[in-house]
Amino acid sequence: MCLCVNLGFHKVKSNKPVALVTKQSILVYKVLSSTDGVHYYTPFVLKSINFDDEYGMFFYKTTRFSFDKEYLSKRNYKHLVVKGAHSYVNLARANYDKIFFEILSGSTTTTHIHYAIIPKGSKFYIGNDCDIASSNLVVFENETKYNENKDYFGDEPIEFSDYLKKFGTELDNK
């Protein structure tokens, strides 16, 4: 999965977009596939996801983002984030890609949408397709585990649309 950086939200420095830093935890959605409803993995990359037994959480920690070679397509995308924890900022887009992944994978797998949090202080990039790539991401096994543990990081996570209303695009993040 690649994220096409939305340059309306990011400064460009040394020909690369500058990551933003979360000022509050953000609620996002992660699409995962499963063959048995117990063992999950990410579509495309096939990274195995093992939820913690007690809290029902899985922690992504990425120290660096990686960018694909610069290219221009019909939609004029210039910067692609390849490495990073990818997720969606709303359920509608997550559901759209869930259906897409199910069609691609055939009848042997099922695809699920999971609640996830980008913790406060994480770096992130906003994409052109309601997607986001972050340096840290906590994925929850189910909605119950999310509701039980969403304040684990010390602040109440907010929807991305509310985050933008509250903080704008404050591009002074370094």
Model-derived features with residue positions:
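Conserved NAD+-utilizing ADP-ribose enzyme module
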Residues: 1-85, 91-174
